[in-house]
């Protein structure tokens, strides 16, 4: 693999996907400290919202320590070079949330849907473009569909106005060959000025290899998370990925030592538990289950006495997707009854 001279835009997820690992309880001070550290390190894009995006505060997904508006209002004025993005899932976030984010100075809106449901994103993508925002179509759980199906859905998002399309490995299930086939198909068939992105999780230990495969196949934006803070076993650990890109002579614009320090001095001390590939996180990747289900399954284990990995395997067998968090408790309860 020769990536010498390629250029990539790195996008940090620690303050959005990392919310899952912190049960959405990141404080305003932690949010500002990490964001300003990333900004100083040269990270160009930083995502800030509830783990499930704008409007995610709910009984189903979890109530955060502060509102999206409070987080964005605290972070955006402190940025010197970095731009702030916000995730929005239609059906959770609304056009009013989108307008609020725009008014507060958000630069990028990432409209996320399940990989077969791009048709629900049209209103939000169109409004985002009308507001002049960098607009991303974010196709989640991409491992569940063929490259051809992902392309079909990507073309819908592109037709609504998205200027960037993401192949999102929400479960950390994909292997480098899978990433290559999906990204190559997108790059070969979408408009030449539509950027391609990749979002990985580390549940099978493949996030860096997958991200490199994505760059080789034509991706220009890569998500990561400083210290890997994210759902499941976390996202692509950004400081490690920066070191790899340095070795491979890929242009990324981030200071390696500075981002190492953010990971070590700011993010690692924030963790409620180590972000690692334990048996439950590994099961997420192996079974192809949405990464944010991890803590829900572990809580269900304590409640019903069914091992979390068995719950996750059953959820994978049933083909559950993001947004079906309510099924975790039901599944565990039914499994406990069968074992009684």
UniProtKB/Swiss-Prot annotation:
It catalyses: (S)-4-hydroxy-2-oxopentanoate = acetaldehyde + pyruvate. It comes from the Bacteria. SUPFAM superfamilies: Aldolase (SSF51569), post-HMGL domain-like (SSF89000). Pfam families: DmpG_comm, HMGL-like. The record marks 16 as: Transition state stabilizer. InterPro entries: 2-IPM_HCS-like (IPR050073), 4OH_2_O-val_aldolase (IPR017629), Aldolase_TIM (IPR013785), DmpG_comm (IPR012425), DRE_TIM_HOA (IPR035685), PYR_CT (IPR000891). Mn(2+) binds at residues 17, 199, 201. HAMAP family: HOA. This is 4-hydroxy-2-oxovalerate aldolase. It comes from Shewanella halifaxensis (strain HAW-EB4).
């Amino acid at each position: 693999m020769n990536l010498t001279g390629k250029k990539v835009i790195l996008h940090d997820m620690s303050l959005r996907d990392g919310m899952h690992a912190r049960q959405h309880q990141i404080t305003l001070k932690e949010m500002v400290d990490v964001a300003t550290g990333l900004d100083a390190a040269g990270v160009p894009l930083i995502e800030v919202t509830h783990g499930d995006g704008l409007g995610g505060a709910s009984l189903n997904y979890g109530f955060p320590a502060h509102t999206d508006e409070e987080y964005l209002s605290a972070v955006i004025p402190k940025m010197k070079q970095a731009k702030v993005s916000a995730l929005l899932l239609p059906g959770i976030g609304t056009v009013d949330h989108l307008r609020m984010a725009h008014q507060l100075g958000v630069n990028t809106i990432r409209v996320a849907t399940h990989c077969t449901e791009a048709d629900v994103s049209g209103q939000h993508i169109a409004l985002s473009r009308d507001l002049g925002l960098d607009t991303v179509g974010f196709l989640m759980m991409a491992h569940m569909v063929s490259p051809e199906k992902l392309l079909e859905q990507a073309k819908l998002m592109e037709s609504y106005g998205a200027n960037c399309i993401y192949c999102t490995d929400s479960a950390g299930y994909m292997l480098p060959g899978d990433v290559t086939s999906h990204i190559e198909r997108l790059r070969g068939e979408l408009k030449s000025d539509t950027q391609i992105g990749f979002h990985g999780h580390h549940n099978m230990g493949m996030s860096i290899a997958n991200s490199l495969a994505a760059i080789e196949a034509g991706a220009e934006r890569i998500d990561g998370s400083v210290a890997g803070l994210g759902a499941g076993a976390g996202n692509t650990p950004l400081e490690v990925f920066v070191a790899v890109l340095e070795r491979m002579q890929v242009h990324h614009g981030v200071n390696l030592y500075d981002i190492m320090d953010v990971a070590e001095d700011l993010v690692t001390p924030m963790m409620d538990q180590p972000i690692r590939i334990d048996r439950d996180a590994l099961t997420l990747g192996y079974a192809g289950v949405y990464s944010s289900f991890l803590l829900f399954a572990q809580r269900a284990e304590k409640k019903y006495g069914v091992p979390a990995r068995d719950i996750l395997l059953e959820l994978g067998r049933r083909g559950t997707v993001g947004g079906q968090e309510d099924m975790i408790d039901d599944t565990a309860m039914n499994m406990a009854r069968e074992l009684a």
